[in-house]
């Protein structure tokens, strides 16, 4: 076989921790990360329980332009990827010298679609949605954005 897949690092950003070490500790301590979300109750969901993931702060990592063009899912995935790269001891030079790709699982990106519809209904103008809305609404948005940010040249796939 001339090509192979190697998993070299791990990273996580979740409701039970924002690093491998935090998640491991939460699992040992039996912490769930599940909270009662009043907003979900007000929207009429049958269950107001949800995993509360802390808001990501990317000001030290990405430019303003990069930050406004990515959705919440990509923010979390970006921080998990940074941890995975550190875990694997991979630096920027490695990307220039090797064909690297990523594989991410993504359930949905419905928030971007809902936000766009809300803007159109309120303002009656599709121009206010912004050109980046289409990319935020794609299930492949995480992989697409991360492959651009990290200048990846390998196969990049989204499983959903």
Regions flagged by a language model, labelled:
Residues 158-160:
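Short beta->alpha junction loops
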Residues 1-155:
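Conserved "HGTGT" condensation-loop signature of ketosynthase/thiolase-family condensing enzymes
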């Amino acid at each position: 076989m001339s090509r192979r897949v190697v998993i070299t690092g791990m990273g996580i950003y979740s409701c039970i921790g924002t690093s491998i070490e935090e998640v491991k500790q939460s699992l040992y301590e039996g912490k769930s990360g599940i909270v009662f979300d009043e907003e979900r109750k007000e929207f009429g969901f049958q269950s107001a329980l949800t995993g509360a993931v802390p808001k990501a702060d990317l000001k030290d990592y990405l430019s303003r332009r990069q930050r406004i063009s990515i959705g919440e899912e990509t923010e979390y995935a970006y921080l998990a990827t940074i941890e995975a790269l550190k875990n694997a001891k991979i630096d920027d030079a490695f990307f220039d010298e090797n064909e690297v790709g990523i594989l991410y699982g993504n359930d949905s990106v419905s928030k971007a679609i809902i936000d766009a519809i809300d803007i159109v209904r309120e303002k009656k103008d599709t121009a206010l949605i912004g050109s980046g809305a289409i990319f935020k609404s794609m299930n492949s948005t995480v992989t697409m954005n991360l492959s651009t940010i990290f200048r990846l040249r390998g196969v990049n796939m989204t499983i959903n």
